């Protein structure tokens, strides 16, 4: 594997300018002080109950995501490039989804193959020909970014359904402010705490009708959902009700919530519930988590769902490989942020290449997420590769492959002190009817194990505070 | 032919239920083979009925039963004028290109057994229409049509094949699943079947009743063609088409978060003697 | 506010209050069980603990006849048993689950108390506790409810969320006091008066202790412990925070606050006020004359009815 780019130290041992102050500070603070602060951070996290559940793990129903106290630093210029590219990407995603559910120009022009849409489980026939309020579909996007050298940021993945992690972005900053006020006095760090206001403004701008103050609610699957903490955290930050399906009902195509003062109309639902569970009259009929009749209110234009139903048609890994073409098709622009080169195993010549190069590639399931069901060639032994090969051959259309990127590393506190670990970045892009809002930075995820490239929290990844320097 | 139809559904709820949302898909649309002369929906509950179109262009009504109540009863009743088009459909409401109907669903999953069955019926030459007929014949020989709940919860394609017998809905699942595997768009149809011989109709189809599921498949040059593999024939003037979707779940005449459902369905030749083909099903 | 949120708050405070009451019952039973029989100690103190907690059927199904109830069984059943839906452990579990569901309606201080208590609960061993450990455990439970009440009182906005939370606690508290009286009413009855020996004193004192009112009794009545005064303190005395009258004074006020905030009142306000009036207008002689037992049974049933009315009116 090629040598990874470290965001703090250049190969010649010099420190990159943005990290100079941090590096000096790290060198000056004794290890035991850092250890102590790290323990303090963990204590605070547990105390306020920021936990998540790991699927398939018994007795570990509530676990902490490791928090790394060394911040990641991004310069103002780097952020400028990133945010323009993110805005472009999300704009194209929205236009693509709107098109797929209406005129299908993109299919007629042959930019995206028809079966990738129609045979896609995330495509919702129910959304066909339905206008959504303000023609926007992806109001809250999380775009995963990786970096390989000083100048190259790749988009690794688009999350257009219900991206999570923003609560960590906000809590990480709060904890850093509490534990290391001196560090903030040495840097000009762009604040992130406006996210709550931005999100509320975005959601309100999406209400189907003008006139009255829109009633916004967050719909959660409930306390057993792995991201429940985030749901309640956001409700708190926004000052809106956190509802479950049973708190809502639909009458004459209008959604109401049950309150102590009787039914109250709901205009915008930020739902953290998958499409399949939203409405048992339309989707899975065994869903206890949804609201019977919700889709009829949605189709009647009386409620906004964020994100819209059916956005998954834009964010699976097979569609991902077409994103550069999609951007060109709708915007007539070159993508500002490149894609990672991707082989689609559904195409025979791609599959052939992938099968011949398995030990050096990363192979992912088209609909997988959370780092499950993937093969990291260079990190796997022969038996694992052969086992995966069998899976791949049995159902090639279900996989894509990418070169194993040398993800950039950042200084990270590990047992033996500070050492480089691989990171990625998930910025959150809010698209309202009035404008696009992006809080500087995002959630940096870090693979805590030496050499590991898998940053997902379900696979033992941790998080860091992400600093965008204002000067 | 003029066919009179009556379809009654009783949906049970937990006693004392309030604000129960219900969707009914009980209003047929006209096309070249059928013309809706009159059609009414009648509920035992006061609510606003506004028609919406679902994804596939079916007319449906979603409403809310205020309650408190323990049941809802819906009666759809009407009269339809039909004519024979040798199974070829014209003038139907189409919201998607045919290729959408290659989509798999849980009920029409191409399991290895379904794939093997479809491959067994594969023709060597490129003849979509011949292929569909061959598939119908193979299916008719493999799966025996069973009397029983036509509108209840039909078996999946795989389960119908495993059991070797299924009601019309299960047979339609297997037909669509196999056709899709062979690259031919296919879809699930719900509707009504009037007795062919008004004198004998009742005796011949005792228990199967007037509610029926079948399939439509797409053959280039012809368009959509109806296939009733259970009876080994293409649609005739005795068929009234109610709804179209990817599987039985999509054409369900009533959906709610309630308990069990009871149905009574009758269709009869309204010019001939008043003989009913009547079905009762429960699920 | 969301009905479900109000419901969760209401039950959250009920469960914390119930845990507190169970801890007091166990405390008093333990104390009485050390006391020699001649001084009012009795062999069936543990049985009456089960009766007071209102889980007789479940207990008997598990451990056999109530008369033979053994200390270790009762302690483990009331304090820790996962099978007993109202064990202290389960009360805390449910309270925390409810708290998680309504975190946005709680202040961080309230959440902190519940969450910390739940974490600390895991540190108590899953075996029979020594007497020392049990005392520490009971002290921890009582302290948790104190901290929770304190956090509620000091940090919550005075709005409908607060009133629902307080209503739950008051309703539960009234129920608990009434149950203690219901199980022990016989030692308060006049027929026993002539005994007047040390045996009765310890029984009366233990009733007062179970509601933390032994000291208060002396301040209020400046008299030796007498059964009708014990009953008066627990039923009618509005100075005594655990008395039925005090609970209903608070409860009626909370429900009225809700009604005036919403601009609408209903059956729960009417029932609460009528019960409050009943407690204000009676004297203790009156109650004894008409039958203490009947009075208490009727109270418990009306109190339950009020719970049902609140649920119907606001929480569903």
Feature annotation, model-predicted:
Chain B
Residues 1-119, 125:
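Linear, non-domain "peripheral" regions
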Residues 3, 168-169:
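Conserved structured core elements
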Residues 11-15, 44-51, 158, 185-189, ...:
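N-terminal start-of-chain detector that recognizes signal peptides
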Residues 18, 70, 106-107, 165-166, ...:
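Short capping/connector residues at structural and topological boundaries
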Residues 24-34, 39-41, 231-252, 256-261, ...:
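Glycine-rich, small/acidic residue-mixed loop/short-helix segments
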Residues 80-84, 89, 96-166, 174-176, ...:
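Secondary-structure boundary elements
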Residues 170-260:
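Hydrophobic/aromatic-rich core segments of domains that either
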Residues 194-200, 276-283:
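Intrinsically disordered, low-complexity linkers and terminal tails enriched in Pro/Gly
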């Amino acid at each position: 594997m090629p040598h990874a780019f470290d965001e703090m130290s250049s190969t010649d041992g010099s420190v990159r300018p943005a990290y100079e102050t941090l590096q000096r500070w790290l060198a000056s603070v004794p290890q035991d002080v850092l250890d102590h602060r790290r323990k303090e951070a963990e204590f605070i996290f547990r105390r306020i109950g920021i936990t998540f559940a790991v699927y398939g793990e018994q007795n570990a129903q509530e676990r902490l995501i490791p928090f790394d106290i060394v911040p990641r630093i991004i310069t103002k210029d780097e952020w400028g490039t990133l945010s323009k590219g993110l805005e472009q990407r999300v704009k194209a995603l929205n236009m693509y989804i709107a098109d797929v559910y209406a005129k299908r120009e993109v299919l007629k022009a042959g930019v995206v193959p028809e079966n990738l849409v129609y045979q896609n489980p995330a495509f919702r026939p129910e959304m066909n020909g339905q206008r959504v309020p303000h023609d926007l579909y992806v109001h809250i996007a999380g775009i995963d970014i990786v970096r390989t050298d000083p100048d190259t940021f790749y988009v690794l993945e688009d999350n257009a359904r219900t991206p999570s992690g923003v609560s960590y972005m906000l809590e990480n900053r709060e904890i850093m402010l509490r534990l290391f006020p001196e560090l903030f006095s040495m840097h000009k760090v762009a604040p992130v705490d406006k996210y709550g206001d931005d999100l509320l403004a975005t959601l309100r701008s999406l209400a189907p009708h003008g006139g009255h103050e829109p009633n916004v609610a967050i719909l959660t699957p409930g306390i057993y959902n792995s991201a429940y903490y985030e749901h309640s955290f956001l409700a708190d930050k926004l000052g809106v009700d956190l509802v479950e399906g049973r708190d809502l009902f639909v009458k004459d195509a209008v959604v109401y919530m049950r309150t102590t003062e009787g039914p109250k109309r709901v205009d915008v639902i930020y739902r953290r519930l998958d499409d399949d569970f939203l409405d048992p009259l339309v989707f899975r009929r065994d869903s206890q988590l949804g609201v019977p009749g919700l889709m009829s209110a949605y189709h009647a234009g009386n409620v906004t769902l964020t994100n819209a139903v059916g956005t998954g048609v834009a964010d699976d890994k097979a569609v991902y490989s077409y994103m550069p073409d999609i951007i060109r098709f709708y915007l007539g622009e070159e993508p500002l942020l490149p894609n990672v080169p991707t082989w689609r195993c559904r195409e025979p010549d791609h599959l052939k290449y992938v099968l011949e190069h398995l030990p050096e590639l990363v192979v992912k399931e088209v609909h997988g997420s959370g780092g499950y069901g993937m093969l990291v060639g260079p990190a796997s032994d022969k038996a694992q590769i052969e086992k995966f090969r069998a899976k791949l051959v049995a159902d090639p259309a279900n996989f894509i492959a990418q070169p194993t990127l040398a993800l950039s590393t950042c200084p990270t506190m590990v047992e033996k002190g500070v050492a480089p670990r691989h990171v990625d970045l998930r910025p959150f892009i809010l698209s309202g009817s009035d404008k696009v809002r992006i809080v500087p930075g995002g959630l940096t995820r870090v693979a805590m194990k030496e050499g590991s490239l898998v940053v997902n929290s379900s696979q033992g990844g941790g998080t860091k505070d992400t600093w965008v320097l204002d000067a | 032919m003029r066919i009179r139809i009556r379809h009654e559904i009783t949906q049970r709820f937990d006693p004392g239920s309030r604000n129960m949302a219900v969707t009914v898909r009980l209003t047929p649309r006209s096309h070249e083979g059928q013309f809706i002369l009159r059609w009414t929906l009648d509920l035992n509950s006061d609510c606003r009925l506004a028609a919406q179109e679902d994804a596939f262009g079916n007319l449906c009504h979603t409403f809310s039963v205020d309650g408190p109540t323990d049941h809802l009863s819906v009666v759809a009743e009407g009269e339809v004028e039909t004519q024979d088009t040798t199974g070829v459909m014209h003038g139907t409401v189409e919201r998607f290109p045919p290729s959408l109907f290659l989509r798999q669903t849980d009920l029409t999953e191409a399991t290895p057994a379904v794939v093997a069955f479809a491959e067994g019926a594969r023709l060597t030459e490129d003849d979509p229409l011949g292929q569909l007929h061959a598939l119908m014949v193979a299916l008719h020989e493999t799966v025996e049509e069973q009397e029983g709940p036509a509108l209840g919860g039909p078996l999946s394609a795989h389960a119908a094949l495993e059991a070797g017998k299924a009601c019309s809905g299960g047979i339609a699942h297997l037909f669509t699943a196999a056709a899709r595997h062979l690259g031919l768009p296919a879809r699930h149809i719900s509707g009504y079947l009037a007795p062919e011989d008004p004198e004998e109709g009742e005796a011949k189809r005792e228990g199967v009743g007037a509610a029926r599921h079948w399939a439509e498949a797409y053959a280039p040059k012809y368009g959509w063609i109806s296939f009733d593999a259970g009876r080994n024939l293409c649609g005739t003037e005795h068929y009234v088409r109610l709804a179209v979707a990817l599987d039985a779940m999509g054409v369900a005449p009533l959906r709610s978060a309630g308990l069990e459902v009871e149905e009574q369905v009758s269709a009869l030749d309204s010019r001939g003697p008043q003989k009913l083909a009547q079905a009762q099903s429960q699920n | 506010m969301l009905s479900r949120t109000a419901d969760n708050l209401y039950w959250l405070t009920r469960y914390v209050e119930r845990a507190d009451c169970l801890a007091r019952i166990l405390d008093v039973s333990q104390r009485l069980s050390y006391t020699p029989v001649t001084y009012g100690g009795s062999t069936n103190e543990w049985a009456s603990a089960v009766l007071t907690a209102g889980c007789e059927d479940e207990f008997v199904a598990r451990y056999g006849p109530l008369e033979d109830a053994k200390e270790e069984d009762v302690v483990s059943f009331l304090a820790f048993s996962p099978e007993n839906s109202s064990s202290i452990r389960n009360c805390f579990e449910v309270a925390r689950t409810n708290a998680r569901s309504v975190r946005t309606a709680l202040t961080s201080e309230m959440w902190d108390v519940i969450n910390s208590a739940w974490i600390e609960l895991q540190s108590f061993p899953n075996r029979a506790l020594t007497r020392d450990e049990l005392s520490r455990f009971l002290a921890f439970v009582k302290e948790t409810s104190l901290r929770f009440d304190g956090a509620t009182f000091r940090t919550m906005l005075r709005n409908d969320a607060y009133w629902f939370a307080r209503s739950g606690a008051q309703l539960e508290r009234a129920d608990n006091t009434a149950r203690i009286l219901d199980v022990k009413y016989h030692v308060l009855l006049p027929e026993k008066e002539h005994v007047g020996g040390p045996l009765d004193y310890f029984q009366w004192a233990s009733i007062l202790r179970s509601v933390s009112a032994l000291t208060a009794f002396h301040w209020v009545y400046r008299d030796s412990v007498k059964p009708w005064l014990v009953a008066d303190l627990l039923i009618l005395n509005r100075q005594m925070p655990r008395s039925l009258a005090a609970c209903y004074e608070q409860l009626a006020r909370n429900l009225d606050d809700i009604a005036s905030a919403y601009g609408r009142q209903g059956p729960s306000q009417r029932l609460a006020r009528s019960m409050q009036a009943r407690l204000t207008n009676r004297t203790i002689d009156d109650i004894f004359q008409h039958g203490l037992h009947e009075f208490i049974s009727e109270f418990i049933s009306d109190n339950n009815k009020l719970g049902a009315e609140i649920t119907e009116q606001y929480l569903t």
